[in-house]
Amino acid sequence: DDSNAASGGDSAKAGSYKVGVVQLVQHVALDAATQGFQDKLTELVEADGGKVEFDVQNASGESANCSTIVNGFVSAGDDLIMANATAALQAAQAATSDIPVLGTSVTDYGTALGISDWTGKTGTNISGTTDLAPLDGQADMLKELFPDAKNVGLLYCSAEPNSKYQIDTIKPLLEAQGYTCTEFAFTDSNDVASVAQNAASGSDVIYIPTDNTAASCTEAIANVVIPA
């Protein structure tokens, strides 16, 4: 019934909780976020005399898989959904307005959830943590490290709205430092190496925002830019 839906399934009444975890892609940073969440929630629940069961699933970098996974959690009546990365959060938003959803590894919730008048609260069943770095501080640090550079390449995945948000925010900050900025956007992991090569050829310094695809392709990017 509706009273159960507001807090997930029926299991919570007995002090036993079912938690679905959807992670966009396997990556050391995302893996650590998932493990940290599991460890702390287990500690808190067991300290209160309860038990928690996790269903951890990885979408292998595919947004469509996130939707399939989250819909499975909803059908199973899970008590809580943890969405690791923006695409996972967006899938959870589309799948349920009743089961509580926690996000992590999400840069900007307003952008991710399509909230234009973002105030820091969703006003919905969704909450979570952000990994947004202080972009003004990053611009200052880049200037401190590379004071003689002229051209900054902004390398990011065009399919990730949070990455575009960061680029749009830091670009004017870098331009105010006197840099000429050029955007180099790749669509997915298939063209990251070629776009990174273009960025390396046309830039003195390359800036990469918090970007899931770039993070999962660190080796491919390094193989291009380090020799350059």
Regions found by a protein language model. Name each.
Residues 1-16:
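Short, low-complexity, disordered segments immediately C-terminal to signal peptides
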Residues 12-39, 44, 55-64, 159-163, ...:
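Extracytoplasmic "Venus flytrap"
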Residues 19, 37, 127-174:
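An alpha-beta-alpha
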Residues 29-40, 65-69, 84-88, 92, ...:
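Stable alpha-helical elements in mature extracytoplasmic
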Residues 52-75, 184-200:
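Structural motif
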Residues 58-117, 211-225:
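Beta-alpha junction/loop-to-helix N-cap segments that form part of ligand/metal-binding clefts
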Residues 78-79, 149, 203-204:
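Short, high-confidence coil segments that cap the C-terminus of an alpha-helix
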Residues 161-228:
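Pocket-lining segment of extracytoplasmic ligand-binding domains
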